[in-house]
Amino acid sequence: MRRVSEITPALRPTPLRIAVLGAKGIPASYGGFETFAEKLSIRLAQRGHAVTVYAESDQAAVPDTVYQGVRVRYRRRPSWGPASVLAYDCACLWDARQGYDLVYMLGYGAAWACWWPRVLGTPVWINMDGLEWARSKWGRLARAYLRCMEWVATFAATRLIADAEAIAQRLRRVYPGGAPSSFIAYGAEPMTEEVPDSSALATWGLQAYQYMVVVARPEPENHLLEIIEGYRLHGGVWPLVIVGDVSGVTPYQKRLLRHASDRVRFVGGIYDPQQLACIRSFAACYLHGHSVGGTNPSLLEAMACGNWVVAHDNPFNREVARDAADYFGTPQELANRLDQVVGQWHQWHTERSQRARDIVATHYTWDGITDAYEALMYAQCRPSMAPPLPADGR
């Protein structure tokens, strides 16, 4: 079956007018939604679609710009504390209520406002972004609100998008009468054959393939304390390097910093892509503790680098890493896995590395993700002109 992108231009369905909301903007400089919005929107624009990505501004009137063929439309984000994100999302939804064939909202915090485009006949998709309400950073009222918005999203949206099949299955099970849900994964950039420059390792006093690394935000659901405990039980000589902004401003971060030593090293956030690729690529193994959410970008990037992955045992991580990772549920299990990594590293590293890269190249390339989105968008907006969906399309 041919992809939409492979159809002769003269025979392709007419281009779509697509709005992407819910990110801080592009080019990406913050997190997963921003990277997703950039990678998807640029590729859709290259295929002839008129794509608009909404971006936040601290000013009331900022003219639109164009970034690699994508219109960037700015809306003010007020300084209202936690409510500022909601106000920004609502402003974007109000502006996008007409003039588009499809509005794609990243996140469901403003799900109730998705009715504004819908009442004017515009389909609205909502990316459900994992179990956002379960994240420890939210207080009780915020969690209750987000749980309510998850429910609202199931009938405010025309379609729900999940970046993990486990999330899509949960939506169908918990909200059987809600909007249809589709699984389209997050993407990653496969590593080139060129070996990254290892000179940056000296910045952190590291030697290639003689350290273990974690890249994560310091939040309880990412299991950093359990990873540190398991590492200490392991008792090996390779240091544990934790990449993330652990500044000690929260009680959890203060607990983490109590374990700082020559063996447990907190190097702060690394935002330069080349430096981050370096510290990942030359790690003996990558420890992944994330447990809330769907397809995790950090896990995909580690696999794209060819890391030997040891991941927290949950459906989301198993769905992504499959047989290219080892899994742990307790600190003692992690210690056992790390003993195996050290003992078998020279024997199995090349094979494990290639398996991880193969999974990314087969299932998680941005071009493949864009193919899936484009086919589903045409099925939604131009059903009479759309090519057939893949057999597993929903």
What do the PLM-derived regions correspond to, one by one?
Residues A19-L21, A202-G235, V241:
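Conserved donor-binding/catalytic core segment of Leloir-type glycosyltransferases
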Residues V85-Q98, L102-D129, W133, G294:
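An aromatic- and histidine-rich active-site surface loop
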Residues R97, R143-L160:
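Membrane-proximal helix-turn-helix segments that form the acceptor-binding/catalytic region
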Residues T154-S181, A188-P190:
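A short, active-site helix/loop in glycosyltransferases that binds the activated sugar's phosphate group
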Residues Q253-Q274:
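Nucleotide-activated donor-binding/catalytic signature segment of Leloir-type glycosyltransferases, i.e.
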Residues C285, A304, W308-A311:
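Short hydrophobic beta-strand element within catalytic cores of glycosyltransferases
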Residues H290-S291:
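Aromatic "clamp/platform" in nucleotide-sugar-dependent glycosyltransferases that forms part
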